[in-house]
């Protein structure tokens, strides 16, 4: 139904730009909200971290610009599509107004009350999604970090093998840590990754612009097949 969805979007916008939010921003809460929002956004879509290009670089393609354009869609789908749908489900079901709910509990409540399924089945669907998301995230970041270590060590696989055991140990330790500690560690390491990568992005921006313009010019001239 378009009407409730429009109302949900209106609620989100009003909450962000209400006089209360603006007044709070004047005393610093706006900066805190921005900090948390940017940190969680980066955690969600990895924009600016330089991690996704590690996987994209493994693709076999004659056109690196095309591969870059394909990789860019990941950020759009993850943030604009998936996160928006999740946010709408939370607002439409009123989960965000329920006291005592935190983290995944809010999403669980939204799924249980939003999906046309029994509550137990809805919770199971969400749990199944979380299992797959967590598992693929573990595999993905292991691949990223192994490629980085392999590059830094000059291809010495003995270091990579030791790192794999450390990584596996960290996976088992993680669930026993507090949520705030996990977020703090994630934010610190994301910042450590983003800083050198942003410097590289600015340094190579001229090359990126040149290659992108050249790609689209050749595409307009019919030199590149769709």
Q: Where would I find each of the regions flagged by the language model?
A:
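Extracellular/periplasmic helix-loop-helix junctions in multi-pass membrane proteins
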Residues: 175-192
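Terminal cytosolic tails of multi-pass membrane transporters
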Residues: 191, 195-226
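Membrane-interface alpha-helices at helix entry/exit sites of multi-pass transporters
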Residues: 61-77, 155-164
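Short, small-residue-biased leader/transition segments that mark boundaries at the very start
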Residues: 1-3
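Membrane-interface interhelical connector segments
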Residues: 92-120
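Select transmembrane alpha-helical segments in multipass membrane proteins
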Residues: 21-44, 81-83, 88-89, 116-132, ...
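Helix-loop junctions at the membrane interface of multi-pass solute transporters
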Residues: 41-47, 51-64, 71-75
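Alpha-helical transmembrane segments
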Residues: 57, 138-158, 207-221
